[in-house]
């Protein structure tokens, strides 16, 4: 069976089911199916052996034991190879080298009151837990009641953070059960407030902190987290452009943690195989720098050559320490986000969520709205109010998607209009605009005599099909602006996306009122329905988990524009809009987000295989015949099942006590 960088098990889903069904009377602890990779390092094998304590007798002979792809022991329970041996899996029992307090303090292994009586005996927990054994459902009921006692979103965010560092399974299971309620607590809009207060609310460190004053320590610091095959997905931030609230210094590590929580929740990446990284390059936030409790470097942000050299060392270290990991850039400032993506996207599989992820989900919403109103993308005119990383990412994604579907690039760019704090971006602004902005600049002659600083006047002349807000200018989409748009567009498509909620360019209730419920609206934060119309949230959690999962499973060498476009088309196809009825909203609900991510990942994988950027089929099938390589199904539905079989689920699994070689690196215990 195929060894996976995503999985922590070596038994296929159906194999495990058959095995446990055939042996229902056996104690769970007697099934030594390996979890693996949580404590492997480089090319050395994990030398796990089952203990011979009276509380846990070895239930099989050495002849029954075979080496798994990661060098651990697992019971050989099948005579013939399984027909789906190339499918990866995240099921099976867990081998655990910890016991007592160490086990209870490990968020990846801890079950709290759900440890079975046999596990309590085997792991020396009997004196440390109340006698009643709870189910996960009972723990979820208790945790949710505790959460409901809390009155503010930030207090609930603190509770969820505490739960995450105690028990990963319970944390993710609780979010999944109450996903619509809790995603806004662990992510936008509440996470922005938690990031701003990071140094005052700090309790326990998570992630890796890299200091620009110690660039030679980068590789060593990254390696403390695991071996070369221990990490699938890395989110890194220098914290300059956090969630619409700007420079937050060291607190930006929280956005990396939040994004990775969504990667696990939505994309099924195992929580023990992700890595949040904070690049501390100083801060220009004077309030933070004056704060005696601030935990990061208090000098001004370092830029120029020293910054670039630091990033170069970081990229080289990632390629060396975690050569197969996908790198996700998050909340870099506008001057760095795009250039770093363009510089490194072909050196390693990398992705910028603010540029590509935002663009992807907005593009999908736009396609869904156009399809619902029988309009063509090539005839669409889009006015983007806010020309930073997000606005440019949306513009580029629209252009790339048009090009992918046969429109000339220059013609596509003519359909995009960008406004920033100076107004509509014109060719005369070249000295004060970035190269990425200038490709969308309009002729000064064409706009002579028009007040290009007025959003109302620009809307009057552009007559946009779609108006997008990425400005963080609260209330910018005024009644006169929206009514002017509605004059020329019976079904205006309006996306106020700025976060947090207080910075939205308009609220959905006003947009629907000013257009007599004719607007097709999606926002950047959650809002309640308006007159029976569900307001979709253009949340990046609809895009980056699926794209990231697809890149991980395909072993992509790069994440191409066509791979992202494939994800966009798949997301647009999942729109719940019905002909003549716009009440269901533009995007699928959060309650189906796991399936949504799996379908996006499938589209990404198939596109990567078509383009030749996928390395998965170059990998040897562990335990297979010499030269036998992995084969990924080309049929969409079959590939979808292949993907789903590899997605981690927040469920408790039986635990096996083992000893391990102390010289072998122990990752994230």
UniProtKB/Swiss-Prot annotation:
Enzyme Commission (EC) number: 1.1.1.38
Top-rank taxon, per record: Eukaryota
Residue numbers annotated as active site: 187 (proton donor), 259 (proton acceptor)
Binding site for fumarate: 142
Cofactor remark from the record: Divalent metal cations. Prefers magnesium or manganese.
SMART domains assigned to the protein according to its UniProt record, in alphabetical order: malic (SM01274), Malic_M (SM00919)
Cellular component per GO, a single term: mitochondrial matrix
Segments passing through the bilayer: none
Binding site for (S)-malate: 499, 539
Comp. bias intervals (Polar residues): 33-43
Alphabetized Gene3D superfamilies for the sequence: Malic enzyme, N-terminal domain, NAD(P)-binding Rossmann-like Domain
Region (Disordered): 33-68
Gene Ontology MF terms in the entry: malate dehydrogenase (decarboxylating) (NAD+) activity; malic enzyme activity; metal ion binding; NAD binding; oxaloacetate decarboxylase activity
Residues that hold NAD(+) according to the record: 387, 390
Keywords carried by this UniProt record: Metal-binding, Mitochondrion, NAD, Oxidoreductase, Transit peptide
Cited function: NAD-dependent mitochondrial malic enzyme that catalyzes the oxidative decarboxylation of malate to pyruvate.
PANTHER family membership: MALIC ENZYME-RELATED (PTHR23406), NAD-DEPENDENT MALIC ENZYME, MITOCHONDRIAL (PTHR23406:SF34)
Name this protein carries in UniProt: NAD-dependent malic enzyme, mitochondrial
Organism of derivation: Saccharomyces cerevisiae (strain ATCC 204508 / S288c)
Gene: MAE1
């Amino acid at each position: 069976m195929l060894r996976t960088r995503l999985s922590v098990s070596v038994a296929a889903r159906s194999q495990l089911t058959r095995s446990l069904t055939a042996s229902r009377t056996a104690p769970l602890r007697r099934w030594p199916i390996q979890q693996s990779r949580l404590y492997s390092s480089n090319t050395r094998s994990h030398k796990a052996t089952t203990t011979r304590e009276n509380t846990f007798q070895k239930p099989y002979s050495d002849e029954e034991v075979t080496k798994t792809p990661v060098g651990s022991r697992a019971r050989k329970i099948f005579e013939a190879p399984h027909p789906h041996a190339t499918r990866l899996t995240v099921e099976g029992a867990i081998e655990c080298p910890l016991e007592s307090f160490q086990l209870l303090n490990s968020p990846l292994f801890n079950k709290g009151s759900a440890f079975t009586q046999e596990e309590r005996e085997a792991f020396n927990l009997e004196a440390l837990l109340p006698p009643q054994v709870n189910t996960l459902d009972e723990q979820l009921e208790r945790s949710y009641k505790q959460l409901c006692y809390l009155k503010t979103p930030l207090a609930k965010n603190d509770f969820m953070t505490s739960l995450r560092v105690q028990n990963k399974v319970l944390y993710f299971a609780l979010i999944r059960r109450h996903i619509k309620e809790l995603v806004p607590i662990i992510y936008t809009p509440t996470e922005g407030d938690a990031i701003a207060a990071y140094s005052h609310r700090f309790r326990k460190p998570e992630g890796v902190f890299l200091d620009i004053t110690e660039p030679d320590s980068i590789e060593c610091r990254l390696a403390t987290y695991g071996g070369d095959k221990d990490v699938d997905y890395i989110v890194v931030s220098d914290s300059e452009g956090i969630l619409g609230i700007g420079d937050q210094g060291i607190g930006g590590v929280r956005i990396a943690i939040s994004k990775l929580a969504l990667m696990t929740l939505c994309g099924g990446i195992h929580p023990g195989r992700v890595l949040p990284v904070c690049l501390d390059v100083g801060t220009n936030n004077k309030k933070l720098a004056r704060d005696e409790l601030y935990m990061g470097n208090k000098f001004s942000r370092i830029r120029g050559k020293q910054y670039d050299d630091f990033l170069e060392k970081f990229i080289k270290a990632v390629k060396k320490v975690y050569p197969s990991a996908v790198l996700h850039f998050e909340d870099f400032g506008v001057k760095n986000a795009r250039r770093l993506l363009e510089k490194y996207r072909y050196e390693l599989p990398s992705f910028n969520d603010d540029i590509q992820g935002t663009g992807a989900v907005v593009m999908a919403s736009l396609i869904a709205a156009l399809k619902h109103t029988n309009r063509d993308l090539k005839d669409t005119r889009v006015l983007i109010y806010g020309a930073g990383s997000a606005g440019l990412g949306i513009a580029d994604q629209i252009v790339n998607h048009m090009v992918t579907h046969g429109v000339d690039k220059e013609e596509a760019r003519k359909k995009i209009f960008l406004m920033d704090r100076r107004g509509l971006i014109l060719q005369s602004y070249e000295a004060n605009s970035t190269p990425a902005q200038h490709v969308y600049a309009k002729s000064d002659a064409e706009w002579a005599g028009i007040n290009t600083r007025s959003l109302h006047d620009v809307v009057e002349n552009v007559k946009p099909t779609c108006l997008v807000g990425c400005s963080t200018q609260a209330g910018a989409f005024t009644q006169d602006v929206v009514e002017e748009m509605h004059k020329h567009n019976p079904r205006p498509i309006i996306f106020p996306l700025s976060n947090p909620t207080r910075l939205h360019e308009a609220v959905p209730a006003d947009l629907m009122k000013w257009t007599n419920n004719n607007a097709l609206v999606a926002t950047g934060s959650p809002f309640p329905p308006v007159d029976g119309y569900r307001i979709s949230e253009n949340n990046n959690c609809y895009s980056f988990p699926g794209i990231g999962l697809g890149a991980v499973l395909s072993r992509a060498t790069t994440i191409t524009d066509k791979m992202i476009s494939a994800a966009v088309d798949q997301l647009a196809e999942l729109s719940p809009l019905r002909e003549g009825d716009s009440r269901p909203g533009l995007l699928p609900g959060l309650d189906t987000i796991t399936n949504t991510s799996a379908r996006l990942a499938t589209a990404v994988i198939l596109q990567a295989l078509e383009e030749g950027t996928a390395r998965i089929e170059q990998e040897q099938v562990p335990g297979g015949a010499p030269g036998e390589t992995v084969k990924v199904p080309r049929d969409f539905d079959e590939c979808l099942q292949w993907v789903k079989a590899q997605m981690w689920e927040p469920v408790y699994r039986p635990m096996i006590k083992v000893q391990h070689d102390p010289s072998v690196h122990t990752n994230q215990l």
